[in-house]
C-alpha cells in the first residue's frame, strides 16, 4: 500500500502542476479525470502490442544486438505508447467544447501521459522496492509528462487545423503529435538499455537538458495561450 501511494504521488503531483499552469481558462475537473482514466486504460493495448512486436522483432534480430535495442525501444515501446496516449487524449477531449485554447492541448496530453505513467509506475513498484519508486518518481514519470508536453503542442496545432477545415494539416500534425514524443521517448529508453559508461553520462545530461527545456516551454506556452481560431 505504501509503495502504491509512492507510485501514484508523482503522477498526481504533475497533473496538479500542469493544471495550475493553465492561466486563462481552467479545464473541467470531470474532463481531466476522464482523460487520466483513459490514459490508465491505454496501458492495456500498449502492453499487448508491445508483446506482439517484441516477438516479431526477435524473429529477425537477436536480442543482444544494437539493432534490436533501437527497434524495440523506438518502435516496440515508444511508438506504441505515444500512439496509445495520444488516442486516449483524443477520444476523451477532441470534441469536448472545453477544448478551445491552445494550452488546453498540452494539459490534456500531459494528463493522458501521466495516467499511463501512474499505472505503469504502480506495476513496476509492486515488483520492486522504495528505491524503484524514488528512481521512477524522479526520472520515468517526469519523462512521460515531457512526452505529453511535446505531444500536446502538435495536438493543439492539429485541432486548430481542423477548425480551419485543413484536413491535410490536421492529419500531419496528429502524426507529429505521436512521432515527436516518440523520438524523446526512444532516446530515453535506448540510453537505459545500453551498457556503456559514456551512455550513462549522456543519459543524465539528456534528462537535465530535456527537463529544463520542457519547464521553460510550458511556461512560454502558458504565457502565450490564446483561443483556438479557424
Question: Predicted segments — roles?
Answer:
Residues 1-230:
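Hydrophobic alpha-helical segments at protein termini of multi-pass membrane proteins
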Amino acid at each position: 500500500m505504501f509503495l502504491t501511494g509512492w507510485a501514484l504521488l508523482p503522477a498526481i503531483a504533475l497533473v496538479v502542476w500542469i493544471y495550475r499552469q493553465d492561466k486563462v481558462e481552467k479545464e473541467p475537473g470531470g474532463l481531466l479525470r476522464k482523460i487520466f482514466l483513459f490514459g490508465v486504460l491505454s496501458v492495456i493495448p500498449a502492453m499487448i502490442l508491445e508483446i506482439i512486436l517484441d516477438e516479431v522483432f526477435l524473429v529477425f534480430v537477436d536480442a543482444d544486438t544494437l539493432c534490436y535495442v533501437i527497434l524495440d525501444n523506438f518502435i516496440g515501446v515508444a511508438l506504441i505508447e505515444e500512439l496509445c496516449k495520444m488516442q486516449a487524449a483524443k477520444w476523451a477531449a477532441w470534441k469536448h467544447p472545453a477544448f478551445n485554447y491552445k494550452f488546453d492541448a498540452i494539459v490534456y496530453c500531459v494528463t493522458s501521459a501521466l495516467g499511463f505513467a501512474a499505472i505503469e509506475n504502480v506495476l513496476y513498484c509492486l515488483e520492486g522496492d522504495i528505491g524503484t519508486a524514488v528512481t521512477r518518481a524522479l526520472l520515468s514519470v517526469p519523462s512521460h509528462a515531457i512526452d505529453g508536453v511535446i505531444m500536446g503542442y502538435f495536438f493543439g496545432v492539429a485541432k486548430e487545423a481542423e477548425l480551419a477545415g485543413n484536413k491535410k494539416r490536421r492529419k500531419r500534425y496528429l502524426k507529429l503529435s505521436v512521432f515527436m514524443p516518440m523520438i524523446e521517448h526512444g532516446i530515453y529508453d535506448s540510453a537505459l538499455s545500453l551498457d556503456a559508461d559514456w551512455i550513462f553520462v549522456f543519459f543524465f545530461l539528456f534528462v537535465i537538458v530535456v527537463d529544463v527545456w520542457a519547464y521553460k516551454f510550458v511556461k512560454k506556452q502558458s504565457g502565450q495561450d490564446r483561443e483556438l481560431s479557424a
